[in-house]
Amino acid sequence: MDQKYNPQAIESKWQKIWHQQKTFATPENLGDKETFYLLVMFPYPSGRIHMGHVRNYAIGDVIARYQRMQGKAVLHPMGWDAFGMPAENAAAQRKVHPRDWTYENIATMREELKSMGLSYDWDREFATCDEDYAHAEQVLFLRLYEKGLVYRKHAFVNWDPVDHTVLANEQVIDGCGWRSGAPVEQRELNQWFFRITHYADELLDNLQHMDGWPETVRTMQTNWIGKSHGVEFAFALEGYPGTLPVYTTRPDTLMGVTFCSVAAEHPIAAAVAENNPAAAAFIKTCQGVGTSEEALEKLEKKGFDTGIKAIHPITGESLPVYIANFVLMSYGTGAVMAVPAHDQRDFEFAKKHGIEIKVVIQPEGQTLHAEQLSEAYTGPGRLVNSGLFTGMDNEQAKQRVAEYFEAQGIGKGTINYRLRDWGISRQRYWGNPIPMVHCAACGVVPVPVAQLPIQLPNEVDFSEPGNPLERHPSWKTCDCPQCGQPARRETDTMDTFMESSWYFLRYCSPHMGGVPLDKAAVDRWMPVNQYVGGIEHAVLHLLYARFFHKALRDIGEVSCDEPFARLLTQGMVRKDTHRCAQHGWRYPKEVQERDGALYCIECGGAVTVGRNEKMSKSKHNVVDPNDLIAGYGADTARLFMLFAAPADRDLEWNDSGVDGAWRFLGRVWRLVLAAIERCGERQACTTTPADEQLKAFRSQLHNTIVKVTEDLNRQSFNTAIAAVMEMSNGAIATFKGEDRLTGEASALLWETAQVTVKLLHPYAPHMTEELWQRMGEQSLLSDTPWPLADAAALVKERVLIVIQVNGKLRSKLEVPVDMAQEAIEKLALADEHVKVQTEGKTIRKVVVVPGRLVNIVAN
């Protein structure tokens, strides 16, 4: 049998065995087994896996294999988030159908994932573009429509001019489309929405109890939901019929209002623009402005004076009303009472337009003067120049102003949310059709469930931008399900975040055809015990999934309130960037090192090392996982990814770290083969050895079991590996030599081999399965229980005591754990290093802390 560690041969062998024996199939008959649902966010089938995938899925696999060895019934599935714009782009560029492109990519990536030795139940695999999944999703859409959680309305939406589709607010990053990067425009369209705002309070309140989630993610969702308490009231208007309703969280600043501003989409703005070309032109420029907080902060504040005046509800002053590019129609009423002295955006606008600034809050110990302000004062203080509210603390004044407004019938206290209903209409082909029909006689009519699924047409034209379904008359034309007259099919498809909002439930019963879920199976497995994925999904996928889960609960499909009990957000994989003056970014293989300097292989020019950044094709700082696995094996790749950094921190790529992981696995390989060669009885040690060295090492071995178990339970994967490394070094030192062992030495080495392969199995499953088999075991290591520590071996007989002189470390002393304090004191004073430090001095005091230290005070 080959004595050399050959990962390529070993890994293909065990992947085949696991596949043939269906080792990781989810058990159907659970009995009284505890269940554990481990899920890593499924990937978009872009064509190839990258190092971020390798890290992500290695983390998930360690958890799944560990829980399996703990005796739990584990559900560990994989699938594909398969709808989306890239497939349409590929269709246009490469003249290939999105479906063909998608399934070809899935086939490639499936094999790449299998080469990592991941313990997936591949029998539960599905792609969200599969007919059954799309069918089931259409059924859920109709059920939520019946529940009143889906509706259609005209609304200003975020329009991506490159992808020619609508984006939800969460999909606009710094004013640009999350995928295309193009500046987003505002357009008014008829759109389908989910009533996520109906669940705003529950989504917010539940976050307080989700202790298994990172605090950063909970904070991000809290801020995104954006619950605020304020006052809603209306300004009377001069020069325009009706009133101007506003919402403010700062009623304490009411007396400092000097103008009002409205969003470009506000009805007042539209009315003014009808007869004013300059206003219409200004509104058009506003529609290209980003909608994120960051974009609005950086934006140059611009406005257009409408000529309309708002009447202050208390002072009666006339205030100018502006159309402003920094006011969002989607927040509050789309109109703002502007207080330039105490709001930075209003301050910048007032300065630019020469509008009066009134200070109405003075901080303690200071006097602010409007003409001297360089920025708005937004801190606490007492009200000034505020009529009957003058002298009040500003927090107290918020409540008093609200009470005054209600008493006077001017306005009322109200609660507002930053969160807006989720617009799911997308103007593209490669998505799930919305199962609705538009009839001239009947209006909007849902497609009966019996007529589902609505399938996408195969013959489509991608030569023009926009939605091909809109240009497909034979598909678009249908009969009204209600009256039978000619009607038009809905041509918008669903946002792809729809698919990822319930896929985790489908894994519980993936073979149900058009029936969405088997509730008994869902109740058996949900919630997901451990979810793993990137923090970039905090207010996109994770928020939508929480909402959708609650909506499905309310129509009886699920029982639990939250879908994910614990969340681990892994860090990014980063690598140095390299740049050549002539050829730009260089891949690592395009750079050569000579005499300590780097040169471009193509032109010989000097290459500079840039920032350590997230691996990306655009910066060429990527390492191909296939090359890594071909060169070192999947076990080395997995081990490095899990050892190089804590799971929730960024990992900085280091080639020497990969070599180190490879060498460590080689040492373990040789250690276990040595045990096979040298151990006579091949029986594990079950009692405490008489030999002191063996006794000490067995204590280290079993303390390592405790350490690794604790580390895996708290997901400190890198420190668990470090503990096994330290223990294996101790084993090599303890059992050095090549002679055949008998008795307690043989038993302990054999126990060491057994424990080592078990502890390493979640990290390096192929190598450890091979070693387990070579040790003569008949069962799969994947089916073997996790090792348990022997309590007797954990009892420490000796302890290391630190000796300090005047608080400074001077020596160490190993003593029996039950040694009397007087004896420890005597040994400490007799220590040669202590004698040197106390020579010629008087010992004033000796403090003995049992089991820890001795401090000698001398002068």
Curated annotation (Swiss-Prot):
The sequence motif named 'HIGH' region is recorded at 43-53
Catalytic reactions on record: tRNA(Leu) + L-leucine + ATP = L-leucyl-tRNA(Leu) + AMP + diphosphate
Cellular component GO terms, alphabetically?
A: cytosol
One Pfam entry for this protein is: tRNA-synt_1g
Instruction: List, in alphabetical order, the Gene Ontology terms for molecular function in this entry.
Output: aminoacyl-tRNA deacylase activity; ATP binding; leucine-tRNA ligase activity
Which keywords does this Swiss-Prot/TrEMBL entry list?
A: Aminoacyl-tRNA synthetase, ATP-binding, Cytoplasm, Ligase, Nucleotide-binding, Protein biosynthesis
* EC code: 6.1.1.4
Q: What domain of life does the native source organism fall in? A: Bacteria
Task: Please provide the Gene Ontology terms (biological process) for this protein.
Answer: leucyl-tRNA aminoacylation
Concerning HAMAP family, the annotation shows:
Leu_tRNA_synth_B (MF_00049_B)
Q: Which family does it belong to?
A: Belongs to the class-I aminoacyl-tRNA synthetase family.
Q: What is this protein called?
A: Leucine--tRNA ligase
Lineage, uppermost ranks = Bacteria, Pseudomonadati, Pseudomonadota, Alphaproteobacteria, Magnetococcales
